[in-house]
Amino acid sequence: MSSPEIASLSWGHMKVKGCSTSYKDCKVWPGGSRAWDWRETGTNHHPGVQPSDLEEILRKGVQTLVIGRGMSEALQVPPSTLDYVKKQGVDVQVFQTEQAVREYNALAGKGEKVGGVFHSTC
């Protein structure tokens, strides 16, 4: 299965190609996407993205995980979370969300098994 491209991004709004739902924050993986609801894991801007936010995507067999930290990069990504992803044998890339979407789409367009989590506001 291929990773779906992100069709559009604006403040507080993301669309994934082939999906009728729009998201504020989202998770994408080969063959699917869904809302990234921070309440599920108790995530906040600080300390930031937790391994539990990423487990679902890592189970999908991605080779690369792209993390979008928000338009102003307010969402933190602790070193322990990066270490967790790397220990799973997955390359991890962290960017401001607009740049993260560009990188994710470039990898998806090449047919790579890429996943991502994207914060579309601050």
UniProtKB/Swiss-Prot annotation:
Start and end residues of each stretch annotated as MTH138-like domain: 6-122
Superkingdom of this protein's organism: Eukaryota
Subcellular location, principal: cytoplasm
Keywords from the UniProt entry: Cytoplasm
Record bears the keyword tRNA processing: no
InterPro entries in UniProt: AAMDC (IPR034096), MTH938-like_sf (IPR036748), NDUFAF3/AAMDC (IPR007523)
A Pfam family matched in the record: DUF498
Family: Belongs to the AAMDC family.
Protein name: Mth938 domain-containing protein
